[in-house]
């Protein structure tokens, strides 16, 4: 889910912090990519329905290969542009996310029921819509994706918990320049730069959104702690929303009161019932100090492609077109041997003014309510990071 409504809010409140870029703008950059999000996008992009029958990309044996096709093609496209992708995979979800995951399971089950109704009615459009809501990336697809990337010589990192948090850790410590994901909570985890729409195909001509956290804070007058509180009020994966608090009210609340505690005390208890499981203190702590492997412990290396391994895996096992795979290997080797010109901005140090924090104000008079935001204890142990198809018919 990420952060509900944050993208629109930032376009309204800090438009200058967001730039529209082409893929080639990131030449020479290391980008930490949320792998699971990318794979999910590749799978749903290749699902469709016609005459009541589902269509998805498979090989001649009927194996779904959407994830491998999309990952191979898009990674090659980035490498062609001189980009150095680093793929980060999700680990164990935090305890705080349990309710959100259960909600997703319930929504997927409901989508399955709606799919069957649409199938009986012969409604291709509704079938496609509901089918995409049931998509889940399988463990097998994750492992196949890791294998493909490693054979291509692209770094793979296994996060101990949330991939966005691990990506943000790499960016904050200078191991990567930006996080590539659709989930806005990459900013909430502290990534200084975030890229959205990185996996959109060139044919759709949708620009990549480059968002700078320091400029967001400077334009809004928020400190990082206040920005995190705003994101929690907007709606995140770790706590339920407070009823009746939309984006504008959340924005005004943090601007006026400076933190969730003071804002909650200002609310009319009769109009805004704070959920008992609104564990905002734990959510805040997780955003500011997530479970990640320290960037200093991660050795990121780009290596030569394993030509024989790629042919064995893609051509012999997954039945990819040999010419396509060989051309891909040639592109990988060309990227390694090509003399890369350094980015001009690498020769300069840019110093920006620190953002100004908004000072908390006294609560409004009126009916008050105290909510300490404490619900559960979050703990975890850090883990070392490690570094010719056709459409099939679903009946």
From Swiss-Prot:
- Region annotation (I-domain) ranges: 126-257
Changes after translation = Phosphorylated. Phosphorylation upon DNA damage induces relocalization to the nuclear plasma.
Q: Which cofactor does it need?
A: Mg(2+)
What top-level branch of life does the organism fall under? Answer: Eukaryota
* UniProt-listed GO biological process terms: base-excision repair; DNA replication, removal of RNA primer
- Annotated stretches, region: Interaction with PCNA: 340-348
> Where is it found, in Gene Ontology cellular component terms?
mitochondrion; nucleolus; nucleoplasm
InterPro entries noted in UniProt: 5-3_exonuclease_C_sf (IPR036279), Flap_endonuc (IPR023426), HhH2 (IPR008918), PIN-like_dom_sf (IPR029060), XPG-I_dom (IPR006086), XPG/Rad2 (IPR006084), XPG_CS (IPR019974), XPG_DNA_repair_N (IPR006085)
What Gene3D superfamilies does this protein's entry cite?
Answer: 5' to 3' exonuclease, C-terminal subdomain, 5'-nuclease
Q: Which family does it belong to?
A: Belongs to the XPG/RAD2 endonuclease family. FEN1 subfamily.
PANTHER family with a match to the protein in the record: FLAP ENDONUCLEASE 1, FLAP ENDONUCLEASE FAMILY MEMBER
Q: What is this protein called?
A: Flap endonuclease 1
